[in-house]
Amino acid sequence: MYSSSSVSKRFVLVPIVVVVTTQLLLVRNVSSLNLTNSYLHHKCVVNQGKYKPGSKYEKSLDDIIQSFSNKDKDSYGFRTGYSMKAYGKEPDMVSITYQCRIDSRGPKCQSCVVTAGYELLRKRCPRYKEAIIWYDQCLVEFSSLDTSGQINYDDNFCMPSAKNLIGNSISLEERLHLLNNLTKIAVTKIDKNIEGIKKPVLYAAGEKRLGTKSLYGMVQCSADLSVQGCNECMLYYIVHFQECWESKQGVRVLSRSCNFRYELYPFISPKGSYYTKF
């Protein structure tokens, strides 16, 4: 981390068995996609200082996290995959933001937010007024400031694959092309899960066949960003971390405001509404 005859009959059957076995494994792998929710990274931010044990700030933080366990308390947020809650006034204001991966909306989103929230509050960054944690399916941020709508250029990290690309098997241009196409879809496709509001989903996933291989990708921006903000965020992080991923078979780049991933294997179910085969 930086801060893809009877003898002849037997010979005919062998490749058939191999193909069928491979297909069964692929079906099983695809059907199990998005079932994991691994911890990825966290950051305790020192700028906003720490709160005192037993303080009003801590109580507000506890109350908000506990409310996430009640599905009726924030059902809209879990259904849409995003929420920003702010309580009190500065310097005692408590702001909690969560963003779930679009294909993890609903119960998966709630489960991830509850797990990540308690992990951040109790284990990773106790007493910090500002902290952020990333899981496979969501991110959760605590803060004493309201930064909604702003691109965060400070809290980010790059997780490249351990495997390098061989030669020019998948060129830099091909990977950039996929990420750019996904970003265009993300900022133009309307979110079908928000009733009465025509808002871009700011998420897209898909795959591109390149010779004998396929390249899989995903992009997402935080729901509080504008279309312009999403475009700017994606461009910034693609360029900012290019040295981290340009020679790698896969990568995850995550920030508070946007993230992207590409791999030489499928990592998101192709059955979703926002999945495209180019």
Swiss-Prot record:
Record Gene3D superfamilies: Gnk2 domain, C-X8-C-X2-C motif
Predominant localisation class: secreted
The family this protein is said to belong to: Belongs to the cysteine-rich repeat secretory protein family.
Domain of life, per lineage: Eukaryota
Designated name of the protein: Putative cysteine-rich repeat secretory protein 19
Signal sequence interval, chain numbering: 1-32
PROSITE patterns: GNK2
Cellular localization per UniProt: Secreted
CC terms in the record's Gene Ontology section: extracellular region
Residue ranges occupied by any Gnk2-homologous domain in the UniProt entry: 39-147, 160-267
UniProtKB keywords: Repeat, Secreted, Signal
